[in-house]
Amino acid sequence: MKATAAILAVMVSSQTFIPVLAADSVDASAIDPVPGAYGYYVDVYTNNSSSNTTQEINPSIGVLSGFLKLWTPGTEWNNGTILDEAILNENIDKAAEITNTRTQKEEDRAYLDDRRNQNYSMISGLGVYAENFIKGANAGTTISDTIPADATTVKYEDGGNSNGVWADETSSLGSIVKFVNTVRNSSASTSSAKAFFKYMRPFRWSEDVSIVSTLIPCKSSDPSNDGGFPSGHTNAAYLAALSLAYAVPERYQEMLTRASELGNNRIVAGMHSPLDVIGGRIMATAVMASMLNDPTNAELKKAAYEQAQNVLLTQTGTSTDQYSDYKTNLKNYTYRLTYGFEQTGDITKAMVVPKGAEALLETRLPYLDATQRRWVLYSTGLPSGYPVLDDAEGWGRLNLFAAANGYGAFDNDVTVTMDASQGGYHALDYWKNDISGSGALTKKGTGTLILSGNNTYTGGTVLEEGSLKAASGTAFGQGDVINSSGTIMEDASEGLTIDGDYTQMEEGTLELNIGSEEDVVNITGQASFDGTLVINFINDYVPANDTEIISFSSLDAGTEFSEVEIHGLPEEYKAQINGEALVVSTEATANDTAEDSDSTDTAESTDETEAGATESPATRDSSGAVFYFAMLAFGITGVVVYNRKSRKNA
């Protein structure tokens, strides 16, 4: 066994396999919350008010106190002290570069994101459901896509819908609207933090930062009441986006991307710097978690989620999805977490998971418990050392986009139970991260979990029920794979490596989707076969004779698949063990042909197999001999079925 966290197998009988998992676990205290100077944000979030002006009392100031390593606020808007000239100069230089290279299209988007209610702006993150939401919520804006010609001299305000609001709480989607409003309007303002830090907007730091011409009328004439850090628009966008993401977790990452885009548009507009935008995101994340943890919001958040699932998502989406490109979303969101600043602080700090942060994932990863969600946040957090991000509680280092992709590491053994009858992510989910760590994965329940990362976890993999799909060649990391009762599916064009032993019990199924000669399952250790093998040939691929489908270093003597099915090939193809591989071929031995003839001439043989089947010869041992599986032909495409159980019981 290669697994660092060994899989210890106990064979109770030929059909019973009890795995005992032992991982070199990270101590459970690793995910314990650490308070800030103000306590825990989720406990004291209502202390964010204009009357509380210190970081020890006001959490909106305290959570951003990392900025004090770069800047000391002055007594006035323009007399603060720069502590880290390199970083603050870089901050303004980045803003200048973005404003000086923006396109007209980017300017127009920046204008719309400035002038529209941020709640309305976030609707586009719903993708194909955006228009359905606008109609169902009676959402509206008076800021049209066509920017008025006189916008360079006239400041336009968003008048909302016909009722003067962005959407109606009395509409068919009113619970969602009310949820967003509640989050936005509860101790969520950036005003206290702006007043405390007194850090100027970028255009006041440098003339190289240019404001979009249509937003010049929006420039405040009173710099003493117009701080840049943190960005209020960004804060509002993330609050609205996270609210919608909670209700519609199917759009979780797209909503995050949309919020990050609005934040970036604040830089494009010339109104904010990258650090301003980062600060807005950090604060909004803490506020959102606080609202989700507040028991007074329990019924409201439930109602919003249920309304989204039962009303909005049951409709056919008609809108164009502007955020359908996952790779682009990932690239943009990840960059905007740090805006390319280098790690100039302590890079050795362990990840800290804020108290209550797990609530941010409770609809996105509903099949995990609260503790497991904290481990997900722990394993997907940003490294330490980036400017502003290292707050005591850990809000700045959360990467919710990555967390929505499941674990980033198995720091201890992980057991996942998915009940497909509950639908949604309970029935099917993708874990796209590259999973490391010494822990093992055990999959239980009837749902399907898909692993698609370049995984290196070493604890091994156990499937007890349901389905586990490998969508990458290294999906199962390093270690033994055990299929006791479920379906392991291979769907990786480059083939699948099982870096250890593979053991399949009688109730297990291995299903392969083979689309090329390279699409092979390579078992580096010993194979022990039982149960069912299903081979689907796809993409019109027809293999040559003796093409390897499964390779292994050795085969457990006396083991074989009870049943084999081949789909997608002409009926003359058969599966066979040839040395240290299972291959497919149209060739048959003389012994095979003779025994085939005998099997169709006697009533006894017919009784032993399904009607119309042709039985293959008995196998020899796996030391290099060849054994053939019988074939049932269904039309043009063959289905090879070898039922070992019926022959043994004859």
Q: Whereabouts are the PLM-identified features?
A:
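Hydrophobic alpha-helical bundle signature of multipass membrane enzymes
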Residues: 12, 24-268, 341, 345-406
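Alpha-helical transmembrane segments that form the membrane-embedded catalytic/substrate-binding core
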Residues: 233-237, 268-297
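C-terminal membrane-anchoring or membrane-association module
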Residues: 635-650
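Extracellular repeat-rich scaffold modules on cell surfaces
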Residues: 408-477
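Extracellular/surface-exposed low-complexity segments
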Residues: 295-363, 367, 385-438, 535-595, ...
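Sec-dependent signal peptide cleavage junction
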Residues: 14-25, 614-624, 643-646
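Ser/Thr/Gly/Pro-rich low-complexity, disordered linker/stalk segments of secreted
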Residues: 589-617
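Extracellular beta-strand/loop-rich repeat segments of large surface/secreted proteins
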Residues: 441, 470-546
